[in-house]
Amino acid sequence: MASRDFLGRFGGEKGSSSDKAGGGAGEPDEVVELSLGLSLGGCFGANSGRDAKKPRLVRSSSLAAMYSLPGTSDDLAAATPPPAPLMRTSSLPTETEEERWRRREMQSLKRLQAKRKRLERRTSMNSGKSGGSSSRDDAQEPLYPSAFQLRRSVVDQGNTSSSMPEQGSADGAEAKSTSSMEISSDNNNNNNASNQNKSLPPPAPSPAGKLPNGIVKEQPPLRTLRSLTMRTTSTGDLRKSMMEDMPMVSSKVDGPNGKKIDGFLYKYRKGEEVRIVCVCHGNFLTPAEFVKHAGGGDVTNPLRHIVVNPAPSVFL
């Protein structure tokens, strides 16, 4: 008790002396609390007396709506804003969900139908190609066994006729005559069969490679001397036809600036404008431009200054 009174008296005396000094100087007094009493917020807490009118510092807190200093209900109501109303969550209506599921089911059904149609079309195409190739092979197969069977029958008949035992002179003569007649008939049949095979066209060679899905891979035709000669003749005919369609022309211009320019008449259709390709530059020119290019200038009738050469030119 004595220590508390002493501290309080010491603090009171200090405060009174400071008040007196402050009053004499005319400056605002600041009372420093030296007591050991606990307060809210330390020296910045709630002070009684003249400091109660000063603005108080709010103690920091983790919650924004709670303050360290208690206040009146009116102050709290004015300071804290009213909470915003919570929006209630709601799911989509059942009708829209059903429509969405129904639309997805229709799309999946359409995709399955399209996939099934593609598979059916592919299988039908593969079966048609395999059936055509098998029928072609069946049509080509009978050509070989027929000739082979004929030759085998002739050989067998010759062997049987040569291995027959002789039974007397008369029987041997009859056997020889019959065997000779059979051999001659067999030879005739063999000749007829060979003639028929020669008259028939040769079978098409079997394709060398087949793809896994049954498609036959066509081989490029072999180049022969006949094909090369036909190619040369065809190129010659093509050149002649090209010369007939696009003849060579040349300019005929008189004057100091006139010069001879070769070109060829470009193929044109009915209703189109005539075009001439000059050999020197390869430009497509009209008759007037062609004559002007040769140095003739502007002329009224440019076709009179152009000569057609039926003979082929050196440039072709």
From Swiss-Prot:
Compositionally biased, Polar residues: which spans?
156-166
Q: Which residues cross the membrane?
A: none
- Which Pfam families did the record assign? EAR, NLS_NINJA_AFP, TDBD
InterPro entries in UniProt = Ninja_fam (IPR031307), Ninja_motif (IPR012463), NLS_NINJA_AFP-like (IPR032310), TDBD (IPR032308)
Q: Does the keyword Nucleus apply?
A: yes
Q: Which UniProt keywords apply?
A: Nucleus
Q: Which GO terms describe its biological process?
A: negative regulation of DNA-templated transcription; signal transduction
**Superkingdom:** Eukaryota
Where are the annotated segments for Disordered? Answer: 1-29, 72-236
Q: Where does this polypeptide localize?
A: Nucleus
| Keyword Nucleus set for record | yes
Q: What is its main location?
A: nucleus
Record's compositionally biased regions (Basic and acidic residues)? 99-108
The Gene Ontology CC terms held by the record are: nucleus
Biased composition regions of type Low complexity, renumbered to the chain:
179-199, 222-235
Family (UniProt) = Belongs to the Ninja family.
List the protein's name.
Ninja-family protein 2
